[in-house]
């Protein structure tokens, strides 16, 4: 009989207060009731969410504004050579190739490059995207760095880049902190 009473007591549903903590006194024998805002129909209304909108804090912090690249990025063509080269007299720029395309295709291609052509480049970035809504494309980008322009040219001559991946040649100044 005691087991039956215990099972009956455990199987009954009790109302619990969610909106505010309830304190019990030894004299209380009834279960606490739910206290929440109710509408005319007796349905409890959910709590109101915080209104989102533009920030009212319009403080503009301008400190230490300077160019990301501290060098002059002119491309110079001389009369004797028909190819374009960069004026690197005062910069620590490294030659790069940016690969653009579907992120999964770029990841697979980067894996193949690390497996077969590791000697033809220095570093390969992870896939990344421009985070602006005005970004010119939604494709992923992988950046490859080279120790010299000759190494980059050797890479471009010997590696077949898939037609689904576009590439751009350029320079990047790397200032390590």
Curated annotation (Swiss-Prot):
Keyword Metal-binding belongs to the record: no
A UniProt-annotated Pfam family: PPV_E2_C
Domain of life: Viruses
Keywords: Host nucleus
Region span, Disordered: 29-57
Coiled coil: none
GO biological process: regulation of DNA replication
InterPro entries xrefs: E2/EBNA1_C_sf (IPR035975), Nucleotide-bd_a/b_plait_sf (IPR012677), Papillomavirus_E2_C (IPR000427)
Subcellular location: Host nucleus
One Gene Ontology cellular component: host cell nucleus
Gene Ontology MF term list: DNA binding; DNA-binding transcription factor activity
Record's keyword annotation contains Transferase: no
Family affiliation: Belongs to the papillomaviridae E8^E2C protein family.
Function of the protein: Plays a role in limiting the replication of viral DNA in keratinocytes. Recruits the host NCoR/SMRT complex to viral replication foci to mediate repression of both viral replication and transcription.
Protein name: Protein E8^E2C
Species assigned in the record: Human papillomavirus 11
